[in-house]
């Protein structure tokens, strides 16, 4: 997207979510202008020096925020909703917030392995007992962090489940599909 926008002579600025802030009801970011892009190099972006920009004056903002879907993620979506209507936010902030990926895919549950989303430990244990082998992970996690393969006889079964539930969010438990490693 950046490559095509540069070809069309758009000015592109990038910033991280940590660098987005609201000051006196004006949305700003600590950002850098992209000067060049070379996807064949390890350091593929050439940037100007980072500086504070007022996002109210931009025509488009493209949200490309990776999970985890946490309070920082949610806050960023609320902040981006402060932009004036004259600024088009692509990947609408409220739509992103309202459609977390692991819940949204439940619209296609008929294409998924048996799945449980819960914080109720006895329901989770019953699900594990029923399917023998499962994968359990935080509902709003990312990058493979805190993903566990469990079987009903795992000596650490309860400890792992309790540890995941101690983080105050639901978990997603799915029947383990052996062929998953083949895509």
List the predicted regions and their residue ranges:
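Conserved N-proximal alpha/beta basic substrate-recognition cap immediately N-terminal to
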Residues: 1-117
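Aromatic-residue detector
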Residues: 18, 30, 71-73, 108, ...
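Short acidic, glycine-rich loop/turn motifs
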Residues: 39, 138-140
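Short, flexible, glycine/charge-rich loop motifs used to bind or transfer phosphoryl groups or to couple energy/partner
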Residues: 50-52, 105-106, 123-126, 161-162
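Phosphate-binding site of ATP-dependent enzymes
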Residues: 121-122, 129-133, 140-183
